[in-house]
């Protein structure tokens, strides 16, 4: 097994190396009194090479990327130990699904959902189909060469016939469920793993008849999110108890539920049945397991990369390959060795990704992305990679410590300048997975982190961390049937802005976002109301002077709220949608991703100080960071980090 530190440092150093050539930040930090709105380009915000899936054809591993523009499939030739070519996939924000038919590799994208064929002999890429559903999550080919796709919103199964170039809609295996997350196909059936409420459905390929295979004893599980198949067995990874379901295809009543043994294991993320064994990977631990079908013995083979997500497990010439972000682990059953192959070091494309968060501690700027954050040193222009197995969604600096809220697991990490790794403080649990904001209350000394629940689950949560006591406490629900999206805190009270969406895929049951107050001493909700009619989200909150709170809504409106009277006193339409908002004295700054606006809080008027950003934020959620000097903002133009000079008054 490769030690965790070596894995993190190797992956981080390799990705960051691609960014060292751009060093414009040095001059930017020392410039004096630049006119407000002056932009300084600091180069790519976050450079990464995250993988989403892979497939073998002969001695070549074809690996697909996520979050690049365009995304690519890189051909890693095992014999040459290098990535010899890339195939551009021009649409979609990522590649989650791949399969092969003969020597052709099929690639499924998401947002938008297109199907591509890579002719590996001719070296040609052809778009062969498109689908109305939001995501293509999973694909598998049948023995007779048809391609089956599982999609989401709604959870649907499609069949693509390469011989005719036509697609057939096989419908929703479990009507009302939003996700088909895993799929396999044999001569007779297509097997679909469903979420957010678990189902395992067999669909007759000829008649379309559907049959539930999931045993009643596990019908209360959340997902069948990964699947492997042999001639005789199916194996499905179930959430959220870290369980593997193994059943006989001919007699589904004969089944076993295998519990992953790593502490806190919740998800089985990839499954392969090969040579009498079920190989599978878990999260959050990143542990790699093997279950023997004949003896029912479970083995822990190692932790190839601590906490990493394994997207796919493949067998090739006697070895087992696991596809992870920018890397592949290789297990040799004959020797028990577990090796690590960094594809970026072997030529896989590293490129600017869609950033997820931005934050400045005054000396450096953190930009969160897949698998960690790029850290831009403002004095030297040097960029380093802080590797974390997850996605930093929100950051906050208190003293000499920067806190990071990490998806998945709704985890809180801490990073101190000069350290090569961030330290895990806690995972939220409580069916939460997506941190939304961070705030610090000086009165109580608490770090406050709101989170969104896992797909299909109700009620977001609010977690409180005390650095002094080392305690981490979670409260759920806080605002009933909503997610807390934004937070600020002062004098022992946290002010909360909500999002009507609970877990993804779960239809909202409320119509309007709320503003609420939560007492950090008594841990009670004090009040809640709806500040902007019809707003889906309160994207950001900021405290002003004299008991005034400001917020930005998904409608692009900024509102002023009197905390004493608990009334909205003024509103102004600023942007096209909600983004970050900061108050500096008698002015505020906010963004909708396209422009940065300055608001005069006395006259309550606004003007754009920067236009044309066209920030390519992951998920379309625009972010903004305020330098502690209050003389600069950090934003994203396209996929580059930019410094914006401001007057701060």
Give residue ranges: language-model regions.
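Beta-strand-rich domains and repeat architectures in extracellular enzymes and scaffolds
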Residues: 42-71, 94-96
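Residue-level signature of beta-propeller blades and closely related beta-rich strand-turn architectures
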Residues: 67, 111, 153, 196, ...
